[in-house]
């Protein structure tokens, strides 16, 4: 029997103020933790950001480290735009471009707590379990219908909207996941205690 996709869905929480592009014009290390608890919606579907990673052109794990290419060109542009790429030729990943024009820094959105449009997410993922719908960068892009068509789009105009968090959150930090270069940098940020993370933070991380 197919589980009911409506009765187990709570009303979405109230949204904060929309974030403007100026929010993203700061250091990637300020933007990344400040995004924890914010809400990302794409065509009205999305949720609370619970996990992100920061990337900067000065370190070798960043796509922008070796300079601009047709693929990463948007990272070298102004802040407040999306950078969408395909990972390993399989999954789409969404980043938010940060810092001033030319700095080539971005925040990878790694996990969401689903709050808006959950039935649509379940259809797209062919999965019912809410905890697993957006528990990874590729998973959340599939759930929100994100593709290369969403690359280089402004974060403050339809179909994308990002809303500031409405209360205090406890942010934990740790090393980034799935990389071999600059793997010791503690540039992963998450919502402490969230069950929607892509992977738990180690007890030694804080």
Curated annotation (Swiss-Prot):
HAMAP family per the UniProt record, alphabetical: 3MGH
Pfam family, one: Pur_DNA_glyco
Gene Ontology biological-process annotations: base-excision repair
Protein family per UniProt: Belongs to the DNA glycosylase MPG family.
Domain of life, per lineage: Bacteria
Keyword Hydrolase in record: yes
Keyword Hydrolase part of the UniProt annotation: yes
UniProt-listed InterPro entries: Formyl_transferase-like_C_sf, MPG, MPG_sf
GO molecular function: alkylbase DNA N-glycosylase activity; DNA binding
SS bond list: none
UniProt keywords, alphabetically: DNA damage, DNA repair, Hydrolase
Protein EC: 3.2.2.-
PANTHER family cross-referenced by the UniProt entry: DNA-3-METHYLADENINE GLYCOSYLASE (PTHR10429:SF0)
Protein name stated in the entry: Putative 3-methyladenine DNA glycosylase
Entry-linked Gene3D superfamilies: Methylpurine-DNA glycosylase (MPG)
């Amino acid at each position: 029997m197919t589980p009911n996709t409506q009765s187990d869905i709570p009303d979405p929480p109230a949204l904060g103020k929309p974030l403007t592009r100026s929010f993203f014009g700061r250091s990637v290390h300020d933007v990344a933790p400040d995004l924890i608890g914010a809400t990302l919606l794409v065509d009205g579907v999305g949720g609370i950001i619970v996990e992100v990673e920061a990337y900067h052109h000065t370190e070798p794990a960043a796509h922008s480290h070796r300079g601009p290419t047709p693929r990463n060109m948007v990272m070298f542009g102004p802040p407040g735009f999306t950078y969408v790429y395909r990972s390993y030729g399989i999954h789409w990943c969404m980043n938010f471009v940060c810092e001033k024009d030319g700095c080539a820094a971005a925040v990878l959105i790694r996990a969401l707590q689903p709050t808006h449009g959950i039935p649509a997410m379940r259809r797209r993922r062919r999965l019912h379990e809410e905890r697993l719908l957006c528990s990874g960068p590729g998973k959340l892009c599939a759930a929100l219908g994100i593709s290369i068509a969403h690359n280089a789009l402004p974060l403050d105009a339809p179909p994308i909207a990002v809303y500031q968090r409405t209360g205090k959150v406890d942010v934990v930090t740790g090393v980034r996941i799935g990389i071999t270069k600059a793997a010791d940098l503690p540039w992963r940020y998450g919502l402490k205690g969230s069950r929607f993370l892509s992977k738990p933070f180690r007890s030694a991380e804080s």
